[in-house]
Each structure stands twice: as C-alpha cells, then as structure tokens.
UniProtKB/Swiss-Prot annotation:
Keyword Electron transport on entry: no
Domain of life: Bacteria
Stated name of the protein: Small ribosomal subunit protein uS12
CDD domains (alphabetical): Ribosomal_S12
Membership in a protein family: Belongs to the universal ribosomal protein uS12 family.
Gene Ontology molecular function terms on file: rRNA binding; structural constituent of ribosome; tRNA binding
Key words of the record: Methylation, Ribonucleoprotein, Ribosomal protein, RNA-binding, rRNA-binding, tRNA-binding
Organism field: Bordetella avium (strain 197N)
Protein's job: With S4 and S5 plays an important role in translational accuracy.
Subunit structure: Part of the 30S ribosomal subunit. Contacts proteins S8 and S17. May interact with IF1 in the 30S initiation complex.
A GO CC term attached to the entry: small ribosomal subunit
Length: 125
C-alpha cells in the first residue's frame, strides 16, 4: 500500500479502455458507401467464402465489414448502415452491415431470427 504522500507525488493511473470499433466514433451505427464487395476465406480451422464489403464511412474512415445472411444485393456505390461487431474467423473485419436498412435488402424467406436479418413477418396462408 502506498503512503498518502507517495500518492500525492504520483497518483494512481486510470486504465484507458480502448474501443473495439473506433471508426464508429462512439456512435451506434454509421452510414457509408461500398467501395468494393468481395468474398474472402476465414482463418485456419474453418473453410468458406465469407461475403465482405469495403465501406467508406461518412466520417472518412474506410472499414471492412461483414454481410451476414444468405444472399445479398450489394454492389459498388451501394449506401449501407454499418454497426460494430467483429467476425472471429476473419482478421481485420470488425464491423457488420445492417440488413434491411438503406440499400441492403433483408434476407429472403427468413423465418427465424428475422429482426437480425431485416426480414418482414411472413403472410399467413
């Protein structure tokens, strides 16, 4: 335990919490324009073609963000909404694109977890 005079000389250091999504600048989401839409392969134990997009945000940042769900209608110059949240098996992907918002449509024929994929409630037969 330090003495009071030691604490007066050198106060306790407050640990700085580093943001996991710095490009959002403490906002819940950010709008951006797709500069490139492509697929990439995940890290070692997994194997797939993951859909990602390089997005230029309104604050000038350029980030790589993940497009969740089956199938999408994104292309270059599409306007999208970007939220935080990384993809564990894709290095450098620290953001997600919000489905069913702006230019990105929701997942077609989605029955469960619809709100996460911007899918409307199916019509009763």
């Amino acid at each position: 335990m330090p003495t009071i005079s030691q604490l007066v000389r050198k106060p306790r250091e407050v640990s700085i919490i580093k943001s996991k999504s710095p490009a959002l600048e403490n906002c819940p989401q950010r709008r951006g324009v797709c500069t490139r839409v492509y697929t990439t392969t995940p890290k070692k134990p997994n194997s797939a073609l993951r859909k990602v997009a390089k997005v230029r945000l309104t604050n000038g940042y350029e980030v790589i963000s993940y497009i969740g769900g089956e199938g999408h209608n994104l292309q270059e110059h599409s306007v999208v909404l970007v939220r935080g949240g990384r993809v564990k098996d894709l290095p450098g992907v620290r953001y997600h694109i919000v489905r069913g918002s702006l230019d990105l449509q929701g997942v077609k024929d989605r029955k469960q977890a619809r709100s996460k994929y911007g899918a409307k409630r199916p019509k009763k037969a």
